[in-house]
Amino acid sequence: MTWPDRDTSAFPSALPGAFDASSAMSRGVVNLSSFSDFLRTQAPHLLPVSGSPGVTPSDAVPHGTTIVALKFPGGVVMAGDRRATQGHMIASRDVQKVYITDDYTVTGIAGTAAIAVEFARLYAVELEHYEKLEGVALTFPGKVNRLATMVRGNLGAALQGFVALPLLAGYDLDDPNPEGAGRIVSFDAAGGHNLEEEGYQSVGSGSIFAKSSMKKLYSQVTDADSALRVAIEALYDAADDDSATGGPDLVRGIFPTAVVITADGAVEIAEQQIADMCREIIQNRSRADTFGPDHAPVRGDEL
């Protein structure tokens, strides 16, 4: 028997609030073959992870801080500490955060370590690739725009908490004034960039303390050596107040890394030079009523 004129209204629709499988599938809301997906859309409180505190990105992956950069007559210097943190734990004490990306640019990384390191490495390959194809190197504004595009491409991850912000420093060969050719560029998570005009910049969790230090000491910058010293002083001040920034580690022999860029190109500063400067800074900052790092041991009868 057939029912050609069957009245579909005789079959009542689903009650208000009831789960409509066909409608859900048509909207791509739920996978009916997965019971967990069904629970996720209809009763998320029944899932085992429901109501439990989530793990923030800063607790799940290592983060690196802090980077400083200063301009001096004829060039620019960039330095970075060596600590990486994972939540409240120290993930690493000897992270490399300052990378030479070509003959006249250097990139410092802060934020999610894995993403930031890939930024620096990929950026170096991008600059080399362009030069091989075009036969000429990118201009400094072109280098800035290329790095900004890479940062903007990470916006989706940044919105989820995996932020990685580079700090770019370089020497602009097209500047007619060699004494003022040093450049420092900072970036935001959306790919916006700012050419620093004050002469110094810092990124990372300790940046507020590092910038305050550089603001007070920048008048002492006259050449590459004095700029390097101010950079190390700024990192020391940042480590003094920010637990995520690592200061000079005399016990393990771990010190900040630094790169100087002039018209002759980018040069990584020798570790021994930085170590000697760190020891001198610590000695000068030691209080008169305490024992300095190189103070002779005190005998019991001298107490």
UniProtKB/Swiss-Prot annotation:
GO terms for biological process: modification-dependent protein catabolic process; proteasomal protein catabolic process. HAMAP family: Proteasome_B_B. Residues 1-64 form a propeptide. It comes from Mycolicibacterium gilvum (strain PYR-GCK). GO terms for cellular component: cytoplasm; proteasome core complex, beta-subunit complex. Its EC number is 3.4.25.1. The formation of the proteasomal ATPase ARC-20S proteasome complex, likely via the docking of the C-termini of ARC into the intersubunit pockets in the alpha-rings, may trigger opening of the gate for substrate entry. Interconversion between the open-gate and close-gate conformations leads to a dynamic regulation of the 20S proteasome proteolysis activity. Pathway: Protein degradation; proteasomal Pup-dependent pathway. PROSITE patterns: PROTEASOME_BETA_2 (PS51476). It catalyses: Cleavage of peptide bonds with very broad specificity. The active site is at residue 65. It is found in: Cytoplasm. InterPro entries: Ntn_hydrolases_N (IPR029055), Proteasome_sua/b (IPR001353), Proteasome_suB-type (IPR023333), PSB_actinobac (IPR022483). Its main location: cytoplasm. Component of the proteasome core, a large protease complex with broad specificity involved in protein degradation. Keywords: Autocatalytic cleavage, Cytoplasm, Hydrolase, Protease, Proteasome, Threonine protease, Zymogen. Belongs to the peptidase T1B family. The 20S proteasome core is composed of 14 alpha and 14 beta subunits that assemble into four stacked heptameric rings, resulting in a barrel-shaped structure. The two inner rings, each composed of seven catalytic beta subunits, are sandwiched by two outer rings, each composed of seven alpha subunits. The catalytic chamber with the active sites is on the inside of the barrel. Has a gated structure, the ends of the cylinder being occluded by the N-termini of the alpha-subunits. Is capped by the proteasome-associated ATPase, ARC. It is an enzyme of class 3 (hydrolase). GO terms for molecular function: threonine-type endopeptidase activity. This is Proteasome subunit beta. It holds the Pfam family Proteasome.
